[in-house]
């Protein structure tokens, strides 16, 4: 059966065959046939249980992955270097296999006896962190949340037994705030680095410094594109490894003329493929939940109208706020023919750009690429950050077309012209750090003790104006003093996994005797939309929403929904009957509990104003204003709203619950579409601006507008009241 290993195993030197327990150390192990036959007698080294039959079935597939052939080269290279850049096409197996190779090597190393190390693998998206960790737990034949776990915002599925942890890049950044040297980790893997998310870019600079202070820590940067040379240069010439994908040729088709309606064109193309092309699943890229759900309905309807002349279809949506169980449906097989020998069934996945690189879906032969994605954009001059539907980059187009060649030669239908591809698309997607509001990032860096932001080692430094705006916002919120140092309030704000305005609102809520209510509002704002509006029952859904409506605005409407949910014992049937999203409500309840724990840690009082008091809703609105005083709009005589200070013309979003047009409103979100909308709005009083945020509403540097004149009157009124009060004394 082969010779036994004689030499001592050192870190990253070799990796044991994962089909063997730590007690069975034959160099070639058992052949797969023997392993399958006697698998029940082999002990899983991770949990001490017998391996299941499924483990060996999966192992056979793992050994077919391109990355498997390079595991020895990978471990040897990492053993000799502190940092390694690895480029691998989506489908090469890098996201699932590299962390397991590393974990095996860490566990096999005897140099740290008694020390429990973690291997961390970051993902830019929550969906990927959850989905990949479940897959890897399956491959290792362990329970998710035990030896393998994941950590995303407001959800920690790990335990004291966890050795391999998939987490969003934002969560690793939060861990660094509590543990600046990330002492629990032996190896950190930054996956999907080409996506250049805000958190990943900050982690680049942070980990570069941590590596200097921790020679025992190793870093693997994994990318799906060849921009990796830039990573190499940034990490001082770290070695670069390339793992080939398993791509078959993909034929690219362009449109002759630009499409006026890419959604309609995408649906039309799906139907044409299903009618005319050989069997094979279809992947359609669209920009967001609403668009995807609309497309799924229309595709089902169009195919249904074709009757028996075509095979059955299974249309599956995929976007970040979809429940995990629904997300897993993308891995289901295509439906079988309706009759024996009849037309083949086909799976049609309609996805956001999450399917570009984060997840690999086998069986895809046809890709439909309209050439758009939602991207974050930020204008620091007017302090507006919004998601805009924008053209993708050439790199993204390449990733999308590559999804079609995973299992056999495929076809990609680009719903734009070849000229547009060559002349209009940028080579790479702009890093998020160059198009984002950096207030939260600056707060995180300050908490990490990084004061010199201008000289922080960003791979692509943000514009100075964007940094200055972030510092200004944090100063107005009281998170930074005038010298730019973190205040006590800022320390507490940084502990909340929320935007700075919401954190400030929570911290000051006890002063307004309404922290219980502000906790509920914050939780509701942190989860997907709680209102369900099915196309076939829109009128009934709108009537149900109106029953929760509060005349003073949307924040109080959300509070009403949360209270009703709790009063009805969190009953899913109540949610269904009232067109309320049960999953969103469960998430809100979970988020609220976590926020309560943070409040308790800082001895922030839990309190409420008497519900029957006239001040009940007034206090809640004042507390909200204390956080969102920079997001105020004023009703002009022309009938439209103007954002205060920035003078942007905006309109109340049609989804609002107000029964009137208040003179002043705070808003939670600025939405750029065909018109500029403010969404989630609440009525406030002008005099509260003077009382709650006088430091911001300094009229000496205010633009000349109706809001300024209204505020001047309010200041004069306050001055008169003060003088009258003095005279009475």
From Swiss-Prot:
Enzyme kind, highest EC tier: hydrolase
Recorded GO MF terms: ATP binding; ATP hydrolysis activity; mRNA binding; RNA helicase activity
Entries under InterPro entries matching the protein: DEAD-box_helicase_OB_fold (IPR011709), DEAD/DEAH_box_helicase_dom (IPR011545), DHX15_DEXHc (IPR044756), HA2_WH (IPR048333), Helicase-assoc_dom (IPR007502), Helicase_ATP-bd (IPR014001), Helicase_C-like (IPR001650), P-loop_NTPase (IPR027417)
Keyword Nucleotide-binding: yes
Protein name per UniProt: Probable pre-mRNA-splicing factor ATP-dependent RNA helicase DEAH3
Catalytic activity: ATP + H2O = ADP + phosphate + H(+)
Keywords: ATP-binding, Helicase, Hydrolase, mRNA processing, mRNA splicing, Nucleotide-binding, Spliceosome
The protein's role, per its UniProt record: May be involved in pre-mRNA splicing.
Ranges of residues in domain Helicase C-terminal: 269-449
Signal sequence coordinates: none
Biological processes annotated in GO: mRNA processing; RNA splicing
PROSITE patterns: HELICASE_ATP_BIND_1, HELICASE_CTER
Domain Helicase ATP-binding: 75-244
Enzyme Commission number(s): 3.6.4.13
Pfam families reported for this sequence: DEAD (PF00270), HA2_C (PF21010), HA2_N (PF04408), Helicase_C (PF00271), OB_NTP_bind (PF07717)
């Amino acid at each position: 059966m082969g010779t036994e290993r004689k030499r001592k195993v050192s870190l990253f030197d070799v990796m044991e065959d994962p089909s063997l327990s730590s007690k069975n150390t034959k160099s070639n192990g058992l052949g797969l046939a023997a392993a399958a036959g006697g698998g029940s007698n082999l002990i899983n080294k991770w949990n001490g249980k017998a391996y299941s039959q499924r483990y060996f079935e999966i192992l056979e597939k793992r050994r077919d992955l391109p990355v498997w052939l390079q595991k020895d080269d990978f471990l040897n290279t990492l053993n000799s270097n502190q940092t390694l850049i690895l480029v691998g096409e989506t489908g090469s197996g890098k996201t699932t296999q590299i962390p397991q190779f590393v974990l095996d090597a860490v566990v096999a190393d005897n140099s740290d006896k008694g020390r429990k190390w973690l291997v961390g693998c970051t993902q830019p998206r929550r969906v990927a962190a959850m989905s990949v960790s479940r897959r890897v737990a399956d491959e290792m034949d362990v329970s998710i949340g035990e030896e393998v776990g994941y950590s995303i915002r407001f959800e920690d599925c790990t335990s004291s037994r966890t050795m391999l942890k998939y987490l969003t890049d934002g969560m690793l950044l939060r861990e660094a705030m509590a543990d600046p040297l990330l002492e629990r980790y032996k190896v950190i893997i930054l996956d999907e680095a080409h996506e250049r998310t805000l958190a990943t870019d900050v982690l680049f600079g942070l980990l570069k410094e941590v590596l200097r202070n921790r020679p025992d820590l190793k870093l693997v940067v994994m990318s799906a594109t060849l921009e990796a040379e830039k990573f190499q240069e940034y990490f001082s010439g770290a070695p670069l490894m390339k793992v080939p994908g398993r791509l078959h040729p993909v034929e690219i088709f362009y449109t002759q003329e630009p499409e006026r309606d890419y959604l309609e064109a995408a649906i039309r193309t799906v139907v044409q493929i299903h009618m005319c092309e050989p069997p094979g699943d279809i992947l359609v890229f669209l920009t967001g939940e609403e668009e995807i759900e609309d497309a799924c309905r229309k595709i089902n309807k169009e195919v249904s109208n074709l009757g028996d002349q075509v095979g059955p279809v299974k249309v599956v949506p995929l976007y970040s706020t979809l429940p995990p169980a629904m997300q897993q449906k993308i891995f289901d097989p295509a439906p079988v023919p309706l009759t024996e020998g009849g037309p083949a069934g086909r799976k049609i996945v309609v996805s956001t750009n999450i399917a570009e690189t984060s997840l690999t879906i086998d069986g895809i032969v046809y890709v439909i690429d309209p050439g758009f994605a939602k991207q974050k954009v930020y204008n620091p001059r007017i302090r507006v950050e919004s998601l805009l539907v924008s053209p993708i980059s050439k790199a993204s187009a390449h990733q999308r077309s590559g999804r079609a060649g995973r299992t056999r030669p495929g076809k990609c239908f680009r719903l734009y012209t070849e000229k547009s591809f060559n002349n209009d698309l940028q080579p790479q997607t702009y890093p998020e750090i160059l198009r984002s509001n950096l207030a939260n990032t600056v707060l995180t860096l300050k908490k990490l003790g990084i004061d010199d932001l201008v000289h922080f080692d960003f791979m692509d430094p943000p514009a100075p104006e964007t940094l200055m705006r972030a510092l200004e916002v944090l100063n107005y919120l009281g998170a930074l003093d005038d010298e730019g140092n973190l205040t006590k309030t800022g320390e507490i704000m940084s502990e909340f996994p929320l935007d700075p305005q919401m954190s400030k609102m929570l911290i000051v809520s006890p002063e307004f005797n309404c922290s219980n209510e502000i906790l509920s509002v914050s939780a509701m704002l942190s989860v997907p939309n709680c209102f369900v509006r099915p196309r076939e029952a829109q009128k009934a859904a709108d009537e149900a929403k109106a029953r929760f409506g509060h005349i003073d605005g949307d924040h109080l409407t959300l509070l009403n929904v949360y209270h009703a949910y709790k009063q009805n014992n969190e009953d899913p049937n109540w949610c269904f009957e009232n067109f309320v999203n049960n999953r969103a409500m469960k998430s809100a309840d979970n988020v609220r509990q976590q926020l309560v724990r943070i409040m308790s840690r800082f001895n922030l009082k839990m309190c409420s104003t008497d519900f029957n008091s006239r001040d009940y809703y007034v206090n809640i609105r004042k507390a909200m204003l204390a956080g969102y005083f920079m997001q105020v709009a004023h009703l002009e005589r022309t009938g439209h709203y103007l954002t205060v200070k920035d003078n942007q013309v905006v309109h109340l979003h049609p989804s609002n619950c107000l029964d009137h047009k208040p003179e002043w409103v705070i808003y939670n979100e600025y939405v750029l579409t065909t018109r500029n909308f403010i969404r989630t709005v609440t009525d406030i009083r002008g005099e509260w601006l003077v009382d709650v945020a006088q430091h911001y509403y300094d009229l000496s540097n205010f633009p000349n507008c109706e809001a300024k004149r209204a505020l001047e009157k309010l200041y004069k009124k306050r001055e008169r009241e003060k003088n009258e009060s003095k005279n009475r004394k």
